[in-house]
UniProtKB/Swiss-Prot annotation:
This is Homoserine kinase. GO terms for cellular component: cytoplasm. It catalyses: L-homoserine + ATP = O-phospho-L-homoserine + ADP + H(+). Belongs to the GHMP kinase family. Homoserine kinase subfamily. It comes from Pyrococcus abyssi (strain GE5 / Orsay). The lineage of its organism: Archaea, Methanobacteriati, Methanobacteriota, Thermococci, Thermococcales. PANTHER family: HOMOSERINE KINASE, HOMOSERINE/4-DIPHOSPHOCYTIDYL-2-C-METHYL-D-ERYTHRITOL KINASE. Pathway: Amino-acid biosynthesis; L-threonine biosynthesis; L-threonine from L-aspartate: step 4/5.
Length: 294
């Protein structure tokens, strides 16, 4: 019997929470139709991603089979709705969908096993099994990753409206991770700790203006901006249009903003991209549910 799985896109880092904060959004997402098979097969619709066993959905599905010691496989039909190299957790969504596809076939309902399998797909895509896309895509909402081993995740109950602006440029995740130094100045680490702690409190209190003010980062963004030379100008356009805060989603190039008039903010940022010779699109979305099957 065929089973369907949907895994949403995500906003990782969420300002100062490098590799720790992540929020699912309502759209876009990846959908998988899966059925049991003697081997691992995949068909892909939508964005161009590997159509063989190098696809992260297959890697994650295989990982779960191996973890539980089962033979066999799955046939996956992936409707790829999250653009690769967009900063919206494309590989994370496919990895979650693939791991859940295997879980539905195998009858596995252990969250930690499914997440660990999905992280194998994320590792293959980005070079690092970071969980700030996989975990919010799986659980939904706003998540704080305390640790992966053992898996400890904290969730903040929040419904946040955001505008996402996606330019027609790519920032490969592996390159965006490589460019971040292993060590940063102590003052930058202290600043990020202060911003991250304050942002969580502001989210819990519903203080969206303060959340916006804290959408900044001293650990990764100063280095990643070298891959996004347009960032400062587009951010300024969003702030001038009334945004409380604007920053990068994940490793970029997508940006997100919060504020009162999200349509005006998105339009201003899109127009600034176009002034710089870069096509872009924007859409308004909000905190999303996690992966689901039906």
């Amino acid at each position: 019997m065929k089973k369907r799985i949907y895994a949403p896109a995500t906003i990782a880092n969420f300002g100062p929470g490098f590799d720790v904060f992540g929020m699912a959004i309502e759209e876009p997402g990846d959908e998988v139709i899966v059925k049991e098979s003697d081997s691992f097969e995949i068909e892909v619709e939508g964005y161009d991603v590997p159509r063989d066993e190098n696809n992260v959905a297959v890697i994650s599905a295989k990982a779960l089979f191996k973890m539980v010691g089962e033979e066999g496989g799955v046939k996956i039909r992936l409707k790829k709705g999250v653009r690769p190299k967009s900063g919206l957790g494309s590989s994370g969504a496919s990895s979650v969908a693939g791991a859940l596809a295997a879980a539905r076939v195998l009858g596995v309902d252990n969250d930690e096993l499914i997440i660990m399998a999905a992280l194998e797909g994320e590792k293959a895509a980005s070079g690092s099994p970071h969980g700030d896309n996989v975990i919010p895509s799986y659980y939904g909402g706003f998540n704080i990753l305390e640790s992966l081993n053992p898996l400890r995740v904290h969730r903040v109950d929040v419904e946040l409206n955001v505008v996402v602006v996606l330019p027609e440029v790519e920032v490969p995740t592996k390159e965006a991770r490589r460019i971040v130094p292993e060590k940063v100045p102590l003052k930058d680490a202290i600043k990020n700790l202060a911003m991250a702690s304050s942002l969580v409190l502001a989210l819990k209190e519903g203080d969206i203006e303060t959340v916006g003010r804290l959408l900044d980062d001293n650990l990764a963004l100063p280095y990643r901006k070298k891959l996004m030379p347009w960032f400062d100008e587009v951010r300024k356009a969003g702030l001038e249009a009334g945004a409380y805060g604007v920053t990068v989603s994940g490793s970029g190039p997508s940006l997100f903003a919060i504020g009162e008039n999200l349509k005006d903010i998105g339009k201003a940022m899109k127009e600034k991209f176009e002034e710089l010779g870069i096509r872009a699109e924007f859409w308004i979305t909000k905190t999303g549910r996690g992966a689901k099957w039906y």
